[in-house]
Amino acid sequence: MNIGILTAGGVCPGVNTLIRSITLREKSQGNRVHGFADGFRGLNQNVKTYFDQEHIDDGPGSILKTSYDFVNVDEAVNNITGLDRLYCICGNESMKSARDLALDDRVDTNIIGIAKTVFNDMPGLESLGFQTAIQELARYIDCAYIEAVSTNSIVFLEVPGRGNNELVVHAGLARNSKITNVITPST
Protein backbone atom coordinates (compact mmCIF):
# COMPACT_ATOMS: atom_id res chain seq x y z
CA MET A 1 0.00 0.00 0.00
CA ASN A 2 1.06 3.60 -0.60
CA ILE A 3 0.58 6.07 2.23
CA GLY A 4 0.82 9.87 2.23
CA ILE A 5 1.31 12.29 5.12
CA LEU A 6 1.04 16.08 5.21
CA THR A 7 0.96 18.76 7.88
CA ALA A 8 -1.00 21.95 7.28
CA GLY A 9 -1.59 25.12 9.28
CA GLY A 10 0.49 26.24 12.23
CA VAL A 11 3.07 24.17 14.05
CA CYS A 12 2.48 22.64 17.45
CA PRO A 13 4.25 20.23 19.80
CA GLY A 14 4.31 16.55 18.92
CA VAL A 15 3.95 16.75 15.13
CA ASN A 16 7.26 15.05 14.30
CA THR A 17 6.62 12.37 16.91
CA LEU A 18 3.26 11.68 15.28
CA ILE A 19 4.78 11.61 11.77
CA ARG A 20 7.43 9.18 12.99
CA SER A 21 4.83 6.96 14.70
CA ILE A 22 2.63 6.82 11.60
CA THR A 23 5.67 6.07 9.44
CA LEU A 24 6.92 3.28 11.70
CA ARG A 25 3.47 1.70 11.93
CA GLU A 26 2.82 1.84 8.19
CA LYS A 27 6.31 0.58 7.28
CA SER A 28 5.97 -2.30 9.78
CA GLN A 29 3.00 -3.42 7.69
CA GLY A 30 5.07 -3.30 4.51
CA ASN A 31 3.62 -0.01 3.24
CA ARG A 32 5.50 2.75 1.41
CA VAL A 33 5.21 6.16 3.09
CA HIS A 34 5.46 9.48 1.24
CA GLY A 35 5.51 12.93 2.81
CA PHE A 36 4.07 15.98 1.05
CA ALA A 37 6.22 19.05 1.73
CA ASP A 38 4.53 22.31 2.76
CA GLY A 39 1.08 20.91 3.50
CA PHE A 40 -1.63 21.37 0.91
CA ARG A 41 0.69 23.57 -1.17
CA GLY A 42 2.93 20.52 -1.63
CA LEU A 43 -0.06 18.31 -2.34
CA ASN A 44 -1.35 20.77 -4.94
CA GLN A 45 2.09 20.81 -6.62
CA ASN A 46 2.81 17.08 -6.02
CA VAL A 47 5.97 17.81 -3.99
CA LYS A 48 6.56 14.56 -2.13
CA THR A 49 9.43 12.49 -0.80
CA TYR A 50 9.74 8.86 0.21
CA PHE A 51 10.04 8.52 4.00
CA ASP A 52 12.51 6.36 5.81
CA GLN A 53 12.04 6.18 9.58
CA GLU A 54 15.74 6.85 10.24
CA HIS A 55 15.32 10.36 8.86
CA ILE A 56 12.56 11.47 11.22
CA ASP A 57 13.42 12.93 14.59
CA ASP A 58 10.98 14.00 17.26
CA GLY A 59 12.23 17.58 17.54
CA PRO A 60 10.04 20.68 17.26
CA GLY A 61 8.25 21.85 14.14
CA SER A 62 7.39 19.61 11.22
CA ILE A 63 9.95 17.67 9.22
CA LEU A 64 7.51 18.01 6.31
CA LYS A 65 7.24 21.79 6.70
CA THR A 66 3.80 23.34 6.66
CA SER A 67 1.84 26.13 5.00
CA TYR A 68 -1.48 27.86 5.33
CA ASP A 69 -2.43 27.12 1.71
CA PHE A 70 -5.76 25.47 1.04
CA VAL A 71 -6.26 22.45 -1.16
CA ASN A 72 -6.92 22.85 -4.87
CA VAL A 73 -9.12 19.77 -5.20
CA ASP A 74 -8.77 19.55 -8.99
CA GLU A 75 -4.96 19.39 -8.74
CA ALA A 76 -4.85 17.30 -5.56
CA VAL A 77 -7.13 14.58 -6.96
CA ASN A 78 -4.53 13.74 -9.60
CA ASN A 79 -1.66 13.91 -7.10
CA ILE A 80 -3.15 11.40 -4.66
CA THR A 81 -4.01 8.88 -7.35
CA GLY A 82 -2.27 5.68 -6.28
CA LEU A 83 -2.32 6.53 -2.57
CA ASP A 84 -4.37 4.21 -0.39
CA ARG A 85 -4.37 6.53 2.62
CA LEU A 86 -3.54 10.18 3.19
CA TYR A 87 -2.97 11.37 6.76
CA CYS A 88 -3.75 15.10 7.03
CA ILE A 89 -2.36 16.51 10.29
CA CYS A 90 -4.24 19.80 10.39
CA GLY A 91 -5.43 22.70 12.47
CA ASN A 92 -8.94 24.11 12.48
CA GLU A 93 -8.89 25.95 9.16
CA SER A 94 -6.72 23.51 7.22
CA MET A 95 -8.92 20.58 8.29
CA LYS A 96 -11.56 22.07 5.98
CA SER A 97 -9.24 21.30 3.06
CA ALA A 98 -8.97 17.68 4.20
CA ARG A 99 -12.76 17.55 4.40
CA ASP A 100 -13.17 19.03 0.91
CA LEU A 101 -10.80 16.45 -0.49
CA ALA A 102 -12.49 13.56 1.33
CA LEU A 103 -15.94 14.59 0.08
CA ASP A 104 -14.94 14.82 -3.59
CA ASP A 105 -16.46 11.97 -5.62
CA ARG A 106 -13.26 11.53 -7.65
CA VAL A 107 -11.19 10.62 -4.59
CA ASP A 108 -10.61 6.91 -3.93
CA THR A 109 -8.00 7.54 -1.24
CA ASN A 110 -8.95 7.25 2.44
CA ILE A 111 -8.42 10.71 3.93
CA ILE A 112 -7.60 10.60 7.64
CA GLY A 113 -7.78 13.94 9.46
CA ILE A 114 -5.77 14.28 12.67
CA ALA A 115 -6.44 17.41 14.74
CA LYS A 116 -3.44 19.47 15.82
CA THR A 117 -3.79 22.86 17.41
CA VAL A 118 -2.53 24.58 20.54
CA PHE A 119 -5.79 26.54 20.71
CA ASN A 120 -8.17 23.62 21.37
CA ASP A 121 -10.59 25.23 18.91
CA MET A 122 -11.93 22.10 17.22
CA PRO A 123 -15.11 21.27 19.14
CA GLY A 124 -15.58 17.60 19.95
CA LEU A 125 -11.98 16.65 19.17
CA GLU A 126 -8.94 16.26 21.36
CA SER A 127 -6.05 17.82 19.50
CA LEU A 128 -2.35 17.10 19.33
CA GLY A 129 -0.32 19.89 20.95
CA PHE A 130 -2.82 21.44 23.35
CA GLN A 131 -1.65 19.72 26.56
CA THR A 132 2.01 20.38 25.81
CA ALA A 133 1.26 24.03 25.05
CA ILE A 134 -0.51 24.30 28.42
CA GLN A 135 2.49 22.80 30.23
CA GLU A 136 4.97 25.09 28.48
CA LEU A 137 2.86 28.20 29.06
CA ALA A 138 2.33 27.27 32.72
CA ARG A 139 6.08 26.98 33.15
CA TYR A 140 6.54 30.38 31.50
CA ILE A 141 3.87 31.88 33.79
CA ASP A 142 5.71 30.48 36.82
CA CYS A 143 8.95 32.12 35.64
CA ALA A 144 7.17 35.44 35.05
CA TYR A 145 5.65 35.22 38.53
CA ILE A 146 9.07 34.65 40.11
CA GLU A 147 10.41 37.65 38.18
CA ALA A 148 7.51 39.84 39.33
CA VAL A 149 7.84 38.84 43.00
CA SER A 150 11.63 39.14 42.97
CA THR A 151 11.61 42.63 41.48
CA ASN A 152 8.38 43.99 42.97
CA SER A 153 7.00 44.34 39.46
CA ILE A 154 3.86 43.71 37.51
CA VAL A 155 4.22 41.35 34.56
CA PHE A 156 1.96 41.29 31.53
CA LEU A 157 1.96 38.23 29.30
CA GLU A 158 0.36 38.26 25.89
CA VAL A 159 -0.84 34.83 24.81
CA PRO A 160 -2.54 33.95 21.52
CA GLY A 161 -5.99 32.49 21.90
CA ARG A 162 -7.89 32.52 18.63
CA GLY A 163 -11.14 33.59 20.25
CA ASN A 164 -11.73 30.83 22.76
CA ASN A 165 -8.91 31.68 25.24
CA GLU A 166 -8.71 28.04 26.36
CA LEU A 167 -4.91 28.01 26.26
CA VAL A 168 -4.46 30.87 28.73
CA VAL A 169 -7.28 29.70 31.01
CA HIS A 170 -5.97 26.13 31.22
CA ALA A 171 -2.37 27.28 31.66
CA GLY A 172 -3.42 29.68 34.40
CA LEU A 173 -5.10 26.85 36.26
CA ALA A 174 -2.45 24.23 35.49
CA ARG A 175 -0.23 24.87 38.49
CA ASN A 176 -2.42 26.93 40.78
CA SER A 177 -0.60 29.89 39.35
CA LYS A 178 -0.76 33.26 40.99
CA ILE A 179 -2.46 34.95 38.05
CA THR A 180 -4.51 37.84 39.34
CA ASN A 181 -6.30 38.86 36.15
CA VAL A 182 -6.80 37.47 32.69
CA ILE A 183 -7.78 40.14 30.20
CA THR A 184 -9.29 38.82 27.01
CA PRO A 185 -10.34 40.78 23.95
CA SER A 186 -14.05 41.00 23.28
CA THR A 187 -15.18 38.88 20.36
What does each model-identified segment do?
Residues 12-22, 43-44, 71-76, 91-99, ...:
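Short glycine/serine/threonine-rich phosphate/pyrophosphate-binding segments
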Residues 8-11, 36-41, 68-69, 91-93, ...:
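Short, ordered loop/turn segments at secondary-structure junctions
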